[in-house]
């Protein structure tokens, strides 16, 4: 609970350069005095805030020396948690870190719950809830663009957009409630047309965030991408080229890949959850047939299909069936083996089969065409404008989390109901019900209107030292 002093290891387990034990709370100074002996200068009570000190860590019971360490001392409220904070920077072995934590707990701190340091930062007003959640997104970012989106949220880009929409809603709500509560006052009636205009403008802002949430989901979870094609067209070679390592087995024997091989790759800043699948063909081999069925299952769930064809061979019935089955779905046709002099594939026939589907000539063996593929996928994820930037030069706010998306969807739905109410001549009383619900749903994102159960669920996903 807030008010006591907590401690936890803040670095990953195992050996490393340093191991950090973090302490936060009103008793942090007492813990520090009980377990640390400075090598030089004044005692702990005379230390300035945000200073480093060399000394030894001792056990408070028998005063045995545990380790030589640097201590960082930070005084409230200018700390991450807004409380007094001390960090013990020990040698990075499991034993000195464990012994230091044990000494700290013995001196009066208790072991922190998962995410409790960040929760205290939220409760202390250091961060709002969206910013607090961004910390775990920074840690788990899979690519440069994913990191950029997380840092943008941590810096408050999303929170500022949400608060702007909430302020607009609140201004409209306040005017309507004043008209209801003080009918005797000579307040201007803004009229149903003005109300509709304001509501649609607010709804557009929410709709824009929802539209960009697809990109946010891709950066957070990865774009589910499946490499498909008949056997021996170069699917595994393509995956190895994208991974830049020999991950899949490449042979001249059709049917070598019998099970799906899944990897995360960073393709120009976009995280792809890429799957190399068994070649699609009719086969009597039971194991290979299971692999083909799995390929079809992956294809049904995919965000993108990379269809690999052999440019040195004619289109087969299997190729054509596969291409026709992908009509209307996000897919890119990759004509492989473009490094070979022999080219038998009928390009006019191919174009007639795929319509507007992009076609790129590649050589998985030589790496040709991969840059063009990367640029195409970036456009498919981001659009022609890329990630985009806000007026202040920072990245535009992206909605990356399902919780935020669901809250925006609820707010959007309440605004739609409010617009319907205005269109049907409903009284301001009915209108304010949906406006309040929309305002509260948005507040769940920043933590202004959120219950303890939601906070428990969010912070329990953090690691103990965060």
Swiss-Prot record:
Binds 1 potassium ion per subunit. K(+) binds at residues 232, 251, 253, 256. It is an enzyme of class 3 (hydrolase). Residues 222-382 form the TrmE-type G domain. Its cofactor is K(+). One of its GO terms (cellular component) is cytosol. Its main location: cytoplasm. GO terms for biological process: tRNA methylation; tRNA wobble uridine modification. Its EC number is 3.6.-.-. It is found in: Cytoplasm. The keyword Ribonucleoprotein does not apply. GO terms for molecular function: GTP binding; GTPase activity; metal ion binding. HAMAP family: GTPase_MnmE (MF_00379). Exhibits a very high intrinsic GTPase hydrolysis rate. Involved in the addition of a carboxymethylaminomethyl (cmnm) group at the wobble position (U34) of certain tRNAs, forming tRNA-cmnm(5)s(2)U34. Belongs to the TRAFAC class TrmE-Era-EngA-EngB-Septin-like GTPase superfamily. TrmE GTPase family. This is tRNA modification GTPase MnmE. The gene is mnmE.
């Amino acid at each position: 609970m807030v008010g006591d002093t907590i401690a936890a290891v803040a670095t990953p387990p195992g050996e490393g350069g340093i191991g950090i034990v973090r302490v936060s709370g009103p008793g942090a100074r007492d813990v520090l005095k009980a377990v640390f002996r400075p090598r030089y200068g004044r005692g702990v009570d005379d230390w300035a805030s945000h200073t480093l000190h060399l000394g030894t860590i001792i056990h408070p019971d028998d005063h045995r020396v545990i380790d030589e360490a640097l201590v960082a001392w930070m005084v409230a409220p200018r700390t991450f948690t807004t409380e007094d904070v001390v960090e013990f920077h020990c040698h990075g072995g499991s034993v000195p870190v464990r012994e230091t934590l044990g000494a700290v707990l013995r001196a009066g701190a208790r072991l922190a719950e998962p995410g409790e340091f960040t929760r205290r930062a939220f409760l202390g007003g250091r961060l709002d809830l969206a910013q607090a959640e961004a910390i775990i997104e920074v840690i788990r970012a899979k690519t440069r663009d994913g990191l950029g989106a997380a840092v943008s949220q941590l810096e408050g880009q999303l929170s500022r957009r949400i608060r702007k929409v909430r302020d607009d809603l609140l201004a409209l709500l306040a005017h309507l409630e004043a008209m209801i509560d003080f009918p005797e006052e000579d307040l201007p009636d803004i009229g149903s047309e003005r109300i509709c205009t304001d509501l649609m403008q607010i709804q557009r802002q929410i709709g824009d965030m929802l539209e960009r949430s697809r990109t946010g989901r891709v950066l957070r979870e990865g774009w589910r991408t499946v490499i498909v094609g008949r056997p021996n067209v170069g699917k595994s070679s393509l995956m190895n080229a994208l991974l830049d390592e020999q991950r899949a087995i490449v042979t001249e024997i059709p049917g070598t890949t019998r099970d799906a091989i899944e990897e995360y790759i960073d393709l120009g800043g976009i995280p792809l959850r890429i799957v190399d699948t068994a070649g699609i063909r009719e086969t009597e081999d039971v194991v290979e047939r299971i692999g083909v069925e799995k390929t079809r299952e992956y294809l049904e769930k995919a965000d993108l299909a990379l269809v690999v064809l052999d440019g040195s061979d004619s289109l087969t019935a299997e190729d054509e069936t596969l291409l026709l089955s992908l009509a209307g779905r996000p897919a890119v046709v990759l004509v492989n083996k473009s490094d070979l002099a022999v080219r038998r594939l009928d390009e006019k026939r191919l174009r007639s089969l795929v319509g507007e589907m992009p076609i790129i000539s590649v050589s998985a063996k030589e790496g040709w065409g991969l840059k063009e593929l990367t640029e195409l996928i970036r456009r498919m994820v981001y659009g022609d404008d890329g990630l985009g930037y806000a007026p202040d030069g920072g990245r535009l706010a992206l909605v990356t989390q399902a919780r935020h998306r669901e809250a925006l969807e609820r707010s959007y739905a309440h605004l739609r109901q409010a617009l319907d109410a205005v269109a049907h001549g409903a009284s301001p009383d009915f209108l304010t019900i949906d406006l309040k619900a929309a305002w509260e749903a948005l507040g769940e994102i920043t933590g202004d209107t959120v219950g303890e159960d939601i906070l428990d669920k969010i912070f329990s996903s953090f690691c103990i030292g965060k």
